[in-house]
């Protein structure tokens, strides 16, 4: 002792206790194990059964004091109050002793061998390997390691009180026992340091859990003494009984699947801190510092990464408690298993996947050693109903701090908290998204385009209704497949839910949170639902919850629907559109292939549900082609029949539905080609002519009167029933167009010309009108094709009809004055002033426009002749009358619906709507009124959505002309809300950029070539002063043959409109001043370029 003290005084390193070589120290001291270890172990075993022992740090001053005492006294009295009050200072000193050893207890030399040994997959082999490596340790190190391991096993047996089970102890002790010189030389930077930490913890944990197997009394020179000493320790088991140890190791053999065997490369950043229940956490700056050293700011789930040690390790970790960045005073593990007895350590160390379930971790950790099988149950419990086995397995491996996070219920695969735009996109399969090309970010709203559509089987129920809830409900449905949200009336289709891309679920499951998924959407969904119901088609299908995989619905509809319709909007690209907050919803209709052709009902819904621009640049096609007046007549007759019924929508609906049914039966076999499709409108016109010549005038007058009388009454009924009718009417219209279109092209053209000539007499009166008005008139004329057809049929009665129109214009002005929704008073004035002027202008402009359009349109049938102009003029007049009538009913959100409700639009008339495009090679334009479930779109500032969310067909992108959009007043809703006086505001859409009609036609042609069965639909919003609900009301009048080029291309915006500046013809010229004709709330008219090669598909739809 004297020599030691003397040497110590001299500063000789030999005499030092801390920081000296272990072997030298033991040789000098003559002890089997360092005195520091023995003293501290005994003290801790007696007094250290406290929470966080060996994990928490003691007071640094106490540690330093105790250190000095060991240096001087060699065996200080640890039972003094200072140490009893700060037990952690003793445990901290013990760790410090090993940490300061020049050569770690397991030595630098054997680091690689230990790493290789634990990399072995099978536990028995790993055990052998580890044993071999341990045999290579110096005897002093081996004895010291055995003593320490047995001490730790003993302490682990109190894991219930200390929360320090074998795994936690291994994590805490590993850095002090096993280190790599190479990694230390590198400065502990990069993944190597994390790998080291993982290897350390795996090695130490394995040794700790296999103490009895690895250390046998006979292997130690002083084994007998050590064993006796250990046996004397309370709770210590006879180390020699390997038999007892074996069962504990068995659990490990079962889980030997553990990835730990995969080796260090899989080792993920090691967390020195074990995850603890947060309620137990206590604070200590020192501990925080210490934790920061090992935690490296990593989250608890990183422990999962390192869990891949071996199955046993992984299980143990999970069962023992998840490792988490420990807060200073927290216990390292969530719950230590009572199983942490020396054997228990093994058992407990056989972590149970229960780590997935934080709550079960604690209990499981205790039970783990005893019930190795519990692991399986634990894992199963972790995600009881989860289909994602792979992800669940990963979770099971790792400690589940993340799972504990309330905000992120990883364990709940179905709930997803994502931005609405993301969920909406996710709701649709990627291929659908690309097809629709309508995917875009919506502000706070689900992308309607992504909304699930009711499959044709579901019925005409407005598909849009499904959309709002779709993504949220879908996520919820996933989480809780059983109960669907009550918010949706329709039961979710489990098949659709199942069909949801598993990949999407897997990729976003971590975000899933059931709690918040639906509420965000509820308002919007309700709104849409109401609209869908108003449409009358809502039904139970209206809300097939988002669970019905909207994506799957899309796929089914897109794939199976006969002629596939790829809709593109001539309006500014959706990507560029700025969404109006909740109102801007993309109707699923836009995306469904069915919408254009297959199911008129659905089509109607879809069509109007499209984003309606404030006003669509593309006005109804200006088809110079004369419309078959026979077809027109028939349309007028139908309209008249319906018009007579206007006061009662039910009657109208019945009549229209009957007509539609009849026509629907006919049309679907008619058009196999574009030519047929194009021809069908003409044929319809001809048929209409034949029928209408006799009684068009009378019928038109009756219809107009009925419109006037019933418009107001119908407005209400229309809002309710119009949607359903529109669907029917659209179907019928399509059918009628198909049936009538083929034979009547020639007749229609001839008649158009003749009538044009006749109307030419009247035309000069309209010449005063500005071309802009003419365009508007043309739009109106399209809507008032009935009237035009009637005029042509009656040719002699044109003057009378004009007078009636004038009267109707006056009435419409008054009506408009009453109902501002339908149109601004300016529109009313325009109508009054411009009925004749519009006719003239329309003739002039049409003539010019049609000439210009004729160049671009393959349809040579579009005649620029006066007949067409006259037709348009007449139609304009009729439209004015109808407009006045409709103005009375402007409240109807969806004019097409409203009109149909009024009886003006019959299914037949809707069919007649189709504009005769050119005969051959032309794109058949069909005016399809659609449900006005459209959300209002503001044409303005073009705000492209984030590129990853904006998906638009490449072909489309190239053709879209984006012009600076001028801000416009919020467009009124087409959903029938009268309060929104935004109809006029739609004109602002004109100012927004959009596809030129030529581009649209070119697109249509290209697509027709590539997709023989595909139906291109160009949807345009009829915006502008002339576009009034009333004008749109008479479907027959809308049948007017217009050049297939939309008027918007030709028209100029009224001076009053914001974007009135002149535009190039390709970019949709801005409107100029419109005559004071009252502008009924413009409604979106959908013109479909249809190449219906498969009429059979239409029928099937």
Swiss-Prot record:
Keywords linked to the UniProt accession: Cytoplasmic vesicle, GTPase activation, Phosphoprotein
| Residue stretches of biased makeup (Pro residues) | 451-465
Q: Which GO terms describe its biological process?
A: signal transduction
Q: Record's InterPro entries?
A: PX-Rho_GAP, Rho_GTPase_activation_prot, RhoGAP_dom
User: Where are the Phosphoserine modifications?
Assistant: 578, 875, 996
What SUPFAM superfamilies is this protein classified in?
A: GTPase activation domain, GAP
Any GO CC annotation of this UniProt entry: cytoplasmic vesicle
Q: What CDD domains does the entry give?
A: RhoGAP_CdGAP
Residue segments, region Disordered: 305-397, 450-499, 622-848, 878-901, 968-987, 1044-1076
Q: Which GO terms describe its molecular function?
A: GTPase activator activity
Q: Does the keyword Phosphoprotein apply?
A: yes
Looking at the record, the residues that make up the Rho-GAP domain are 20-215
Show the coiled coil region(s).
none
Role of this protein: GTPase-activating protein (GAP) for RAC1 and RHOA, but not for CDC42.
Quaternary structure note? Interacts with RHOU in a GTP-independent manner.
List the PANTHER family hit by this protein, alphabetically.
Answer: CDC42 GTPASE-ACTIVATING PROTEIN, RHO GTPASE-ACTIVATING PROTEIN 30
According to UniProt, the name of this protein is Rho GTPase-activating protein 30
User: What is the originating organism of this protein?
Assistant: Mus musculus (Mouse)
């Amino acid at each position: 002792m004297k020599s030691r003290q003397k040497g110590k005084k001299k500063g000789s390193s030999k005499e030092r206790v801390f920081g000296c070589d272990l072997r030298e120290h033991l040789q000098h001291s003559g002890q089997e194990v360092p005195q520091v270890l023995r003293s501290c172990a005994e003290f801790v075993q007696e007094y250290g059964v406290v929470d966080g022992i060996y994990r928490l740090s003691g007071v640094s001053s106490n540690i330093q004091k105790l250190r000095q005492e060991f240096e001087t006294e060699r065996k200080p009295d640890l039972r003094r109050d200072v140490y009893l009050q700060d037990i952690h200072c003793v445990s901290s000193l013990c760790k410090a002793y090993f940490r300061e050893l020049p050569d770690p207890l397991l030595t630098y030399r054997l680091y690689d061998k230990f790493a290789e040994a634990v990399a072995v997959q099978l536990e028995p082999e790993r055990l052998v390997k580890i044993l071999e490596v341990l045999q290579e340790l110096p005897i002093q190190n081996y004895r010291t390691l055995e003593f320490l391991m047995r001490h730790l096993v003993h302490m682990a047996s109190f894991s219930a009180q200390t929360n320090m089970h074998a795994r936690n102890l291994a994590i805490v002790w590993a850095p002090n026992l096993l280190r790599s010189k190479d990694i230390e030389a590198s400065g502990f930077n990069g993944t190597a340091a994390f790998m080291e930490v993982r290897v350390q913890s795996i090695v130490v944990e394995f040794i700790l859990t296999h103490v009895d197997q690895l250390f046998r009394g006979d292997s130690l020179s002083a084994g007998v003494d050590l064993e006796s000493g250990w046996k004397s320790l309370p709770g210590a088991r006879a180390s020699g009984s390997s038999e007892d140890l074996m069962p504990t190791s068995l659990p490990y053999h079962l889980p030997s699947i553990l990835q730990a065997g995969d080796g260090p490369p899989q080792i993920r950043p090691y967390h020195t801190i074990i995850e603890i229940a947060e309620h137990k956490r206590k604070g200590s700056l020192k501990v925080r510092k210490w934790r920061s050293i090992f935690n490296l700011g990593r989250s608890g789930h990183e422990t999962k990464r390192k869990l891949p040690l071996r199955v046993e390790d992984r299980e143990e970790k999970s069962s023992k408690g998840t490792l988490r960045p420990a807060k200073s005073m927290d216990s390292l593990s969530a719950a230590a298993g009572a199983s942490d007895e020396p054997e228990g350590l093994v058992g407990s160390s056989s972590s149970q996947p229960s780590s997935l379930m934080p709550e079960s971790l604690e209990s499981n950790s205790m039970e783990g050693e005893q019930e190795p099988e519990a692991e399986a149950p634990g894992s199963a419990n972790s995600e009881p109903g989860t289909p994602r086995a792979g992800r669940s397995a990963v979770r099971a491996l790792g400690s589940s701090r993340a799972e504990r996070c309330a905000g992120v219920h990883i364990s709940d695969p179905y709930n997803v908290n994502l931005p609405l735009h993301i969920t909406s996109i996710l709701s649709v399969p990627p291929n659908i998204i690309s097809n629709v090309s309508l995917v875009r970010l919506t502000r706070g709203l689900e992308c309607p385009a992504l909304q699930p559509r009711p499959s044709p089987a579901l019925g005409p129920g407005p598909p849009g209704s499904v959309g709002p809830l779709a993504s949220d409900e879908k996520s919820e449905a996933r989480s809780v497949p059983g109960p669907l949200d009550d918010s949706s009336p329709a039961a979710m289709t489990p098949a659709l839910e199942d069909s949801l891309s598993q990949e999407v679920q897997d990729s976003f499951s971590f975000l899933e949170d059931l709690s918040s998924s639906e509420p965000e959407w509820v308002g919007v969904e309700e709104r849409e639902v109401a609209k869908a119901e108003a449409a009358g088609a809502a039904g139970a299908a209206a809300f097939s919850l988002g669970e019905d995989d909207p994506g799957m619905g899309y796929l089914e509809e897109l794939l199976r629907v006969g002629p596939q319709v790829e809709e593109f909007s001539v309006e500014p690209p959706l990507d560029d559109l700025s969404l109006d907050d909740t109102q801007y919803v993309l109707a699923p209709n836009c995306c469904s292939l069915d919408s254009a052709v297959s199911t008129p009902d659905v089509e109607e819904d879809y069509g109007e549900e499209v984003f309606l621009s404030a006003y669509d640049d593309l006005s109804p096609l200006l088809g110079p082609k004369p419309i078959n007046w026979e077809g027109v007549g028939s349309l007028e007759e139908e309209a008249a029949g319906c018009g007579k019924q206007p006061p009662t929508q039910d009657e109208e609906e019945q009549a229209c539905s009957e007509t539609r049914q009849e026509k629907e039966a006919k049309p679907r076999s008619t058009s196999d080609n574009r030519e047929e499709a194009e021809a069908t409108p003409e044929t319809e016109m001809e048929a209409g002519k034949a029928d209408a010549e006799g009684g068009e005038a009378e019928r038109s007058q009756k219809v107009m009167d009925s419109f006037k009388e019933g418009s107001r009454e119908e407005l209400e009924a229309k809002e309710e029933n119009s949607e359903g009718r529109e669907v029917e009417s659209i179907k019928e219209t399509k059918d009628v167009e198909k049936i009538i279109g083929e034979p009547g092209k020639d007749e229609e053209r001839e008649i158009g010309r003749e009538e044009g000539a006749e109307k030419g007499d009247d035309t000069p009166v309209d010449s005063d009108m500005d071309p802009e008005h003419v365009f508007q008139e043309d739009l109106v004329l399209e809507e008032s094709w009935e009237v035009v057809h009637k005029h042509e049929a009656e040719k002699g009665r044109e003057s009378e009809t004009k007078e009636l129109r004038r009267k109707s214009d006056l009435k419409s002005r008054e009506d408009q004055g009453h109902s501002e929704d339908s149109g601004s008073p300016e529109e009313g004035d325009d109508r009054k002033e411009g009925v004749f002027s519009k006719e003239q202008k329309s003739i002039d402009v049409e003539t010019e426009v049609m000439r210009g359009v004729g160049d671009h349109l393959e349809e040579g049938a579009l005649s620029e002749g006066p007949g067409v102009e006259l037709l348009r003029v007449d139609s304009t007049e009729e439209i004015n009358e109808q407009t006045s009538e409709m103005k009375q009913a402007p409240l109807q959100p969806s004019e097409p619906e409203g009109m149909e409700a009024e009886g003006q639009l019959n299914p037949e008339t809707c069919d007649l709507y189709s504009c005769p495009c050119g005969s051959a090679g032309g794109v058949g334009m069909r005016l399809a009124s659609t449900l006005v479930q459209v959300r209002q779109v503001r044409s303005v500032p073009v705000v492209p959505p984030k590129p990853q969310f904006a998906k638009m067909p490449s072909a489309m992108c190239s053709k879209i002309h984006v012009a600076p959009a001028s801000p416009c007043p919020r467009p009124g809703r087409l959903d029938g809300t009268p309060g929104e006086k935004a109809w006029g505001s739609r004109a602002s859409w004109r100012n927004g950029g959009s596809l030129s009609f030529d581009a649209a036609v070119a697109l249509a042609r290209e697509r027709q070539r590539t997709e023989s069965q595909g139906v291109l639909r160009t949807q345009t919003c009829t915006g502008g002063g002339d576009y009034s609900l009333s004008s749109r009301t008479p479907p027959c009048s809308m049948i007017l043959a217009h050049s297939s080029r939309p008027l918007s291309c030709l028209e100029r915006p009224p001076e009053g409109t914001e974007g009135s500046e002149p535009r190039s013809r390709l970019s949709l010229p801005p409107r100029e001043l419109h005559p004071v004709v009252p502008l009924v709330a413009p409604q979106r008219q959908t013109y479909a370029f249809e190449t219906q090669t498969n009429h059979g598909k239409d029928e099937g739809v």
